[in-house]
């Protein structure tokens, strides 16, 4: 099976069912609200946002979840330790199940925290 190469975030979104597209569009809107200077890119064949040379956050959709991805810092994992217990989490991804409401406030908090980290690194 050939790997699909997307040219932009709209093309990525269009390859998923409408309900998933809406969730991804919500995440995209959150990022733009919190980090209006972030640049939209496709990296590793998934949507991502950069501030300068640094990646703010990635997201990707799967059959049963949407992943928020980044190399999560120890500080971020510690700050959101309690909230993260509700999700499957790895060193680089937080899985948001499609059968549950999208945790908008939590996503906003993560993006704000990541923005602080990225700005501090520049």
Ranges and model annotations:
Residues 1-122:
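Charge-dense, helix-prone N-terminal extensions
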């Amino acid at each position: 099976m050939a790997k699909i190469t997307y040219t932009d975030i709209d093309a990525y979104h269009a390859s998923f069912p409408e309900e998933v597209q809406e969730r991804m569009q919500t995440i995209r809107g959150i990022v733009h609200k919190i980090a209006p200077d972030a640049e939209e890119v496709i990296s590793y064949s998934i949507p991502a946002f950069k501030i300068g040379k640094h990646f703010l956050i990635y997201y990707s959709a799967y059959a049963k979840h949407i992943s928020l991805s980044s190399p999560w810092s120890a500080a971020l994992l510690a700050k959101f330790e309690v909230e993260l217990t509700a999700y499957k989490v790895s060193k680089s991804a937080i899985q948001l199940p499609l059968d549950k409401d999208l945790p908008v406030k939590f996503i906003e908090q993560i993006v704000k925290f990541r923005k602080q980290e990225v700005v501090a690194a520049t």
